[in-house]
Amino acid sequence: ASDVYKRQVKLRSNEESEINGQGPVITEDNIKKLYEKLDCLKESDVLVLAGSIPDVMPSSMYMDIMKHLEGRGINIVVDATRNLLTNVLAYKPFLIKPNNHELGEIFGVEITDKDDVIKYAKKLQEQGARNVLVSMAGDGAVLVTENGQEFKAKAPKGKLKNSVGAGDSMVAGFVYGYLKSNDYK
């Protein structure tokens, strides 16, 4: 079924708003079919777990998926907030992608510069993340790799039209670049 039960409107600024509706009803059979598809993944495949979990699903869903796939050599990317992100660290995700505000929320601090991002990204690595990519809106991004490399990138010049999907695009670009070159640069 695709019934919508609630809507949430977020006014982010004078230029942008966000409207979220609750997703469809998800049954145990739907979850079983998801796991059947996940079982088709092979070593070195990339799985991206992104966004929030519908209320009708267990809040441990990302963690459950990672536990289910553990030891199979699948590169799992997690782009989520707070507990959805921190709960998966024990399963050593290939990449996590918080933004600087989400990173600060995890540690109860305000993060405003790239040096702070690096400091707290390394703390997430100590908890299990292999690579940490942190987006910083107009201030660019930081990548801290499992090899100890630190990359700082500036945001592209230009006029922002709409930031919706920017983080998702960053994850997609990283995954594409990594798969193409097998390098973090």
Region locations from a protein language model:
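A polyampholytic, Gly/Pro-enriched intrinsically disordered region
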Residues: 15-22, 94-105, 119, 123
